[in-house]
């Protein structure tokens, strides 16, 4: 019975790690056909924001220029001009289909992530007792580490999150989140978030050192500053 109680939090931890993937996959598959059918039959207009409009227009202009260049190489004739018009028409339809699929992708992924967040929040609330046990284990593990190991771990974590090369990692992570939610890639927004998050984290971390570590373990702060210098 004691072993079973001891392993229960571990099973709960494993479920927290793997459950989001399973929920996301299942919800995505369940909603895919419904969202596709709803969008294709219930929407009479295509809604585009400024970024999507600009992207679609750029693709259309690029396509038109390529087809026009291809026709410039050939001899001019009525047949070629007709083929040029037909080619423009076909490729325009293809661009519209791609844009339609992108909109479905956005709605599907956004809905999936919202549902997953609600389910996992409820799962975490119901498993609050197990989370308390896991938290006590983590605190005990950290307490048993030496100050040198703690300082090294803090230094490694801060360098990864707010170090010199951290913007590249933030850019990849924020871009991945953008893609996961189905949003259109926006360099300006991503650059703004990349330049803001590390500064906020750095401020929070310095406050944490000043407010808590100096009181709990002054020797750890001394070792950390020595290693950081």
Swiss-Prot record:
The chain crosses the membrane at residues 7-27, 107-127, 189-209. It comes from the Eukaryota. The keyword Ion transport applies. Its main location: plastid. Pfam families: CemA. GO terms for biological process: potassium ion transport. It is found in: Plastid, Chloroplast inner membrane. GO terms for molecular function: antiporter activity; proton transmembrane transporter activity. It catalyses: K(+)(in) + H(+)(out) = K(+)(out) + H(+)(in). Keywords: Antiport, Chloroplast, Hydrogen ion transport, Ion transport, Membrane, Plastid, Plastid inner membrane, Potassium, Potassium transport, Transmembrane, Transmembrane helix, Transport. Disruption phenotype: Enhanced induction of non-photochemical quenching (NPQ) leading to pale-green phenotype in developing leaves under continuous-light conditions. The keyword Transmembrane helix applies. One of its GO terms (cellular component) is chloroplast inner membrane. It is a multi-pass membrane protein. Belongs to the CemA family. Contributes to K(+)/H(+) antiport activity by supporting proton efflux to control proton extrusion and homeostasis in chloroplasts in a light-dependent manner to modulate photosynthesis. Prevents excessive induction of non-photochemical quenching (NPQ) under continuous-light conditions. Indirectly promotes efficient inorganic carbon uptake into chloroplasts. This is Potassium/proton antiporter CemA.
């Amino acid at each position: 019975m004691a072993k079973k109680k001891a392993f229960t939090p571990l099973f709960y931890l494993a479920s927290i790690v793997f459950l989001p993937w399973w929920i996301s996959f299942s919800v995505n598959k369940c909603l895919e056909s419904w969202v596709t059918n709803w969008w294709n039959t219930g929407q009479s207009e295509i809604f585009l924001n400024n970024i999507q409009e600009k992207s679609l227009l750029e693709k259309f202009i690029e396509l038109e220029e390529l087809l026009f260049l291809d026709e410039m190489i050939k001899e001019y004739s009525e047949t070629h001009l007709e083929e040029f018009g037909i080619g423009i028409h076909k490729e325009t339809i293809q661009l519209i289909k791609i844009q339609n699929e992108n909109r479905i992708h956005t709605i599907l992924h956004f809905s999936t992530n919202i549902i997953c967040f609600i389910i996992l929040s409820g799962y975490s609330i119901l498993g609050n007792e197990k989370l308390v046990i896991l938290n006590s284990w983590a605190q005990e593990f950290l307490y048993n580490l030496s100050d040198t190991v703690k300082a090294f771990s803090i230094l490694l974590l801060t360098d990864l999150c707010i170090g010199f090369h951290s913007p590249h990692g933030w850019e990849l992570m924020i871009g991945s989140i953008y893609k996961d939610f189905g949003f259109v890639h926006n360099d300006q927004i991503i650059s703004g978030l990349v330049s803001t998050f590390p500064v906020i984290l750095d401020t929070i971390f310095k406050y944490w050192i000043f407010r808590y570590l100096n009181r709990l373990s002054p020797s750890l702060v001394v070792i950390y500053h020595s290693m950081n210098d």
